[in-house]
A protein has these predicted regions:
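Short conserved segments within the C-terminal catalytic ATPase subdomain
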Residues: 52-62
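Short helix-loop "hinge" at the ATP-lid/N-box region of the Bergerat-fold HATPase_c
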Residues: 86-87
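Acidic ATP/Mg2+-coordinating residue in the GHKL
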Residues: 113
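Short conserved segment of the HATPase_c
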Residues: 118-132
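Conserved glycine-rich
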Residues: 159-160
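Short alpha-helical segment of the dimerization/phosphotransfer core of two-component systems
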Residues: 6-14
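Short beta-strand/loop element within the Bergerat-fold HATPase_c
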Residues: 93-105
Length: 188
Protein backbone atom coordinates (compact mmCIF):
# COMPACT_ATOMS: atom_id res chain seq x y z
CA UNK A 1 0.00 0.00 0.00
CA UNK A 2 2.89 2.35 0.78
CA UNK A 3 4.51 1.66 -2.59
CA UNK A 4 1.21 2.25 -4.38
CA UNK A 5 0.82 5.60 -2.60
CA UNK A 6 4.36 6.59 -3.56
CA UNK A 7 3.74 5.62 -7.20
CA UNK A 8 0.52 7.62 -7.28
CA UNK A 9 2.28 10.66 -5.78
CA UNK A 10 5.09 10.46 -8.36
CA UNK A 11 2.60 10.02 -11.22
CA UNK A 12 0.71 13.13 -10.10
CA UNK A 13 3.99 15.05 -9.82
CA UNK A 14 5.00 14.03 -13.35
CA UNK A 15 1.57 15.03 -14.65
CA UNK A 16 1.88 18.49 -13.05
CA UNK A 17 5.40 18.85 -14.43
CA UNK A 18 4.27 17.94 -17.95
CA UNK A 19 1.44 20.46 -17.73
CA UNK A 20 3.83 23.25 -16.68
CA UNK A 21 6.31 22.35 -19.43
CA UNK A 22 3.50 22.56 -21.99
CA UNK A 23 2.49 25.95 -20.57
CA UNK A 24 6.07 27.17 -20.87
CA UNK A 25 6.33 26.04 -24.49
CA UNK A 26 3.15 27.95 -25.42
CA UNK A 27 3.92 31.22 -23.62
CA UNK A 28 5.11 33.16 -26.65
CA UNK A 29 1.86 32.51 -28.52
CA UNK A 30 -0.26 34.26 -25.87
CA UNK A 31 -1.13 37.87 -26.79
CA UNK A 32 0.13 40.41 -24.21
CA UNK A 33 -1.84 43.53 -25.16
CA UNK A 34 -4.72 43.89 -22.69
CA UNK A 35 -5.08 46.59 -20.03
CA UNK A 36 -4.62 44.79 -16.71
CA UNK A 37 -5.41 46.19 -13.27
CA UNK A 38 -2.79 44.40 -11.20
CA UNK A 39 -4.53 45.04 -7.84
CA UNK A 40 -7.80 43.20 -8.61
CA UNK A 41 -5.88 40.43 -10.40
CA UNK A 42 -3.71 39.94 -7.29
CA UNK A 43 -6.79 39.96 -5.04
CA UNK A 44 -8.27 37.19 -7.24
CA UNK A 45 -5.10 35.13 -6.77
CA UNK A 46 -5.29 35.60 -2.98
CA UNK A 47 -8.93 34.51 -3.00
CA UNK A 48 -8.05 31.40 -4.99
CA UNK A 49 -5.14 30.56 -2.66
CA UNK A 50 -7.04 31.36 0.56
CA UNK A 51 -7.85 27.68 1.32
CA UNK A 52 -4.15 26.73 1.10
CA UNK A 53 -3.22 29.69 3.30
CA UNK A 54 -5.94 28.88 5.85
CA UNK A 55 -4.75 25.27 5.99
CA UNK A 56 -1.28 26.56 6.96
CA UNK A 57 -2.69 29.32 9.24
CA UNK A 58 -1.18 32.04 7.04
CA UNK A 59 -2.78 35.46 6.55
CA UNK A 60 -2.81 37.03 3.07
CA UNK A 61 -2.66 40.79 2.47
CA UNK A 62 -2.68 42.82 -0.74
CA UNK A 63 -2.17 46.56 -1.16
CA UNK A 64 -1.84 48.92 -4.08
CA UNK A 65 -2.95 48.95 -7.68
CA UNK A 66 -1.45 49.79 -11.05
CA UNK A 67 -2.34 49.50 -14.70
CA UNK A 68 -0.11 47.55 -17.07
CA UNK A 69 -0.42 46.08 -20.55
CA UNK A 70 -0.13 42.33 -20.80
CA UNK A 71 -1.92 39.00 -20.67
CA UNK A 72 -4.28 38.51 -17.75
CA UNK A 73 -3.80 34.74 -18.00
CA UNK A 74 -0.02 34.95 -17.83
CA UNK A 75 0.07 37.66 -15.16
CA UNK A 76 -2.39 35.65 -13.06
CA UNK A 77 0.01 32.68 -13.31
CA UNK A 78 2.97 34.89 -12.38
CA UNK A 79 1.29 36.25 -9.23
CA UNK A 80 -0.17 32.81 -8.40
CA UNK A 81 3.23 31.11 -8.54
CA UNK A 82 4.90 33.76 -6.38
CA UNK A 83 2.14 33.76 -3.76
CA UNK A 84 1.85 29.97 -3.74
CA UNK A 85 5.61 29.70 -3.11
CA UNK A 86 5.36 32.32 -0.37
CA UNK A 87 2.57 30.34 1.33
CA UNK A 88 4.42 27.05 0.87
CA UNK A 89 7.59 28.33 2.56
CA UNK A 90 6.09 30.63 5.22
CA UNK A 91 5.88 29.59 8.83
CA UNK A 92 2.43 28.79 10.25
CA UNK A 93 0.84 31.84 11.86
CA UNK A 94 2.71 34.27 9.60
CA UNK A 95 1.60 36.65 6.83
CA UNK A 96 2.22 36.80 3.09
CA UNK A 97 2.10 40.37 1.76
CA UNK A 98 1.57 41.39 -1.86
CA UNK A 99 2.23 45.06 -2.60
CA UNK A 100 1.91 46.93 -5.87
CA UNK A 101 3.17 50.42 -6.65
CA UNK A 102 3.72 52.49 -9.79
CA UNK A 103 6.95 54.50 -9.75
CA UNK A 104 6.10 56.49 -12.92
CA UNK A 105 7.85 54.16 -15.36
CA UNK A 106 7.52 50.71 -13.86
CA UNK A 107 5.06 48.81 -11.75
CA UNK A 108 6.72 47.11 -8.80
CA UNK A 109 5.08 43.95 -7.49
CA UNK A 110 6.50 42.60 -4.25
CA UNK A 111 5.60 39.28 -2.64
CA UNK A 112 6.92 38.99 0.89
CA UNK A 113 6.92 35.80 2.95
CA UNK A 114 8.11 34.80 6.40
CA UNK A 115 9.90 31.62 5.42
CA UNK A 116 13.44 30.30 5.90
CA UNK A 117 15.03 32.55 3.28
CA UNK A 118 17.11 31.82 0.19
CA UNK A 119 20.91 31.61 0.54
CA UNK A 120 22.75 34.29 -1.47
CA UNK A 121 24.49 31.80 -3.77
CA UNK A 122 21.12 30.48 -5.05
CA UNK A 123 19.24 33.74 -5.63
CA UNK A 124 19.73 33.61 -9.40
CA UNK A 125 19.68 29.82 -9.80
CA UNK A 126 16.15 29.52 -8.37
CA UNK A 127 14.76 30.85 -11.67
CA UNK A 128 16.27 27.95 -13.66
CA UNK A 129 13.92 25.08 -14.59
CA UNK A 130 14.05 22.14 -12.15
CA UNK A 131 16.37 23.93 -9.73
CA UNK A 132 15.91 22.89 -6.08
CA UNK A 133 17.72 24.32 -3.08
CA UNK A 134 17.97 20.84 -1.61
CA UNK A 135 16.12 17.55 -1.75
CA UNK A 136 14.82 17.80 1.80
CA UNK A 137 13.04 21.08 0.95
CA UNK A 138 11.66 19.41 -2.16
CA UNK A 139 10.08 16.62 -0.12
CA UNK A 140 8.91 18.92 2.66
CA UNK A 141 7.33 21.61 0.47
CA UNK A 142 6.46 19.81 -2.78
CA UNK A 143 6.56 21.32 -6.26
CA UNK A 144 8.38 20.41 -9.46
CA UNK A 145 10.98 23.19 -9.57
CA UNK A 146 9.26 24.97 -12.46
CA UNK A 147 7.19 27.69 -10.78
CA UNK A 148 9.88 30.36 -10.60
CA UNK A 149 11.18 29.47 -14.08
CA UNK A 150 7.67 30.18 -15.35
CA UNK A 151 7.62 33.48 -13.41
CA UNK A 152 10.94 34.42 -15.07
CA UNK A 153 9.61 33.65 -18.57
CA UNK A 154 6.32 35.51 -18.06
CA UNK A 155 8.12 38.53 -16.63
CA UNK A 156 10.53 38.60 -19.60
CA UNK A 157 7.62 38.35 -22.06
CA UNK A 158 6.16 41.47 -20.46
CA UNK A 159 9.46 43.37 -20.73
CA UNK A 160 10.22 43.16 -17.03
CA UNK A 161 12.60 41.68 -14.50
CA UNK A 162 12.24 39.49 -11.42
CA UNK A 163 14.68 39.09 -8.56
CA UNK A 164 15.09 38.20 -4.93
CA UNK A 165 15.00 41.71 -3.45
CA UNK A 166 15.78 40.66 0.12
CA UNK A 167 16.12 37.36 1.93
CA UNK A 168 17.10 36.29 5.43
CA UNK A 169 16.08 33.69 8.00
CA UNK A 170 13.03 35.93 8.61
CA UNK A 171 11.69 35.67 5.07
CA UNK A 172 12.08 36.63 1.44
CA UNK A 173 10.77 39.45 -0.73
CA UNK A 174 10.47 38.73 -4.44
CA UNK A 175 10.40 41.82 -6.68
CA UNK A 176 8.86 41.92 -10.15
CA UNK A 177 9.35 45.12 -12.16
CA UNK A 178 7.12 45.58 -15.22
CA UNK A 179 6.78 48.56 -17.57
CA UNK A 180 3.68 50.52 -16.60
CA UNK A 181 0.95 51.17 -19.15
CA UNK A 182 2.31 54.53 -20.36
CA UNK A 183 5.83 53.14 -20.91
CA UNK A 184 4.47 50.00 -22.60
CA UNK A 185 2.37 52.11 -25.01
CA UNK A 186 5.37 54.22 -26.06
CA UNK A 187 7.44 51.08 -26.68
CA UNK A 188 4.87 49.53 -29.04
Amino acid sequence: AELLGLLQEQTERMSRMTKVLLEMSELRSVPCEDDIELGPLSEEVLTDLAPLAEHKDIALNCSGCALIIGSDTLLYRLVFNLVENAIRYSRPGSTVNVSICDNNSHVLLRVEDQGPGIPKQYRESIFQPFFRLDKSRSRAYGGAGLGLALVWEITALHGGTVEVETSSENGTTMLVSLPNRSVALTEQ
